[in-house]
Design a protein with these regions (language model features):
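N-terminal metal-binding scaffold of metallo-dependent hydrolase/deaminase domains
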Residues: 1-42, 53-55
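Divalent metal-coordination and catalytic microenvironments
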Residues: 8, 26, 31, 52, ...
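Active-site gating loops and adjacent loop-to-helix segments of metal-dependent hydrolytic enzymes
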Residues: 71-105, 134-137, 165-184
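Alpha-helical packing segments of well-folded alpha/beta enzyme cores
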Residues: 105-112, 116, 145, 187, ...
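Short acidic/polar active-site loop segments enriched in Thr and Asp
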Residues: 122-123, 155
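Residue-level "edge-of-site" marker
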Residues: 129-130, 162
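Metal-coordinating catalytic core of metallo-dependent amide/deamination hydrolases
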Residues: 135-224
Length: 224
């Protein structure tokens, strides 16, 4: 089926350079774009008038927030309040837990991915916070994310994070990093397993990525 989309601004290319076509159109058949430009005289099966809209290639977001609390935790608190959002030393040494269930994690990812697509992003490198994790992101969590991304048609470069330490706020209010290098090594192995099993999956929508957490929470050995 051949489809024609018309709009006020069409972002295309001519001789390798970007060009804006005013009141232009995009023609595609199945999954292939066959024309971008001002006019198209051949018959089509369906015409969609997008009106006063920008029709462009999908955007690429290499800092794609794929949760719904990241900005609240990372951007808005001042230095003093931010200390209260880090783990305590007691929590680090105690019974840590996953705050969100698997179903809640899936909702957060799906909601975030849909928001990316609604804002024109078709290729994303997801990032998210780790305050609420038992340690870092997991293989199972990212396998679920990959399925959601593929279902929505979003191209993603992804892999579970891994780290050998975590920022904590001590009883005196000072911040430091506490270490568990065994968890860092285990996380790296999980990340490698994800890349091996998911890179190129779902028709190439999933691209595997080794994504260590913040550099101050990784040992030199883990990064190497």
């Amino acid at each position: 089926m051949k489809t024609k989309i018309t709009g006020r601004y069409i972002i295309g290319h001519v001789d390798g350079s970007p060009l804006v076509f005013m009141d232009g159109c995009v023609i595609y058949e199945e999954d292939t774009i066959i024309y971008v430009g001002s006019t198209y005289e051949e018959p089509v099966d369906l015409t969609i008038d997008a009106g006063n809209a920008i029709i462009s290639p999908g955007f690429i977001d290499l800092d794609a927030l794929c949760d719904i609390d990241h900005a609240i935790l990372d951007a808005y608190p001042g230095p003093e309040l931010a200390k209260g959002l880090e783990w305590s030393e007691a929590y680090f040494r105690g019974e840590r837990e996953e705050i969100f269930t698997s179903e809640e994690e899936a909702f957060r990812r799906r909601y975030a991915f849909v928001q990316l697509i609604m804002n024109g992003v078709t290729t994303a490198l997801p990032i998210s916070g780790e305050y609420h994790k038992h340690w870092a992101e997991t293989y199972d969590e990212f396998a679920q994310m990959a399925e959601i991304a593929a279902e929505l048609g979003l191209r993603v470069y992804m892999g579970p994070s891994y780290r050998s330490g975590v920022m904590v706020t001590q009883a005196n209010g000072e911040q430091t990093v506490l270490w568990d290098e065994a968890l860092g090594t285990a996380g790296l192995h999980e990340a490698v397993r994800f890349v091996k099993q998911y890179d190129g999956k779902y028709g190439g929508l999933i691209k595997g990525l080794l994504a260590p957490a913040r550099i101050q929470t990784c040992t030199t050995e883990l990064l190497q």
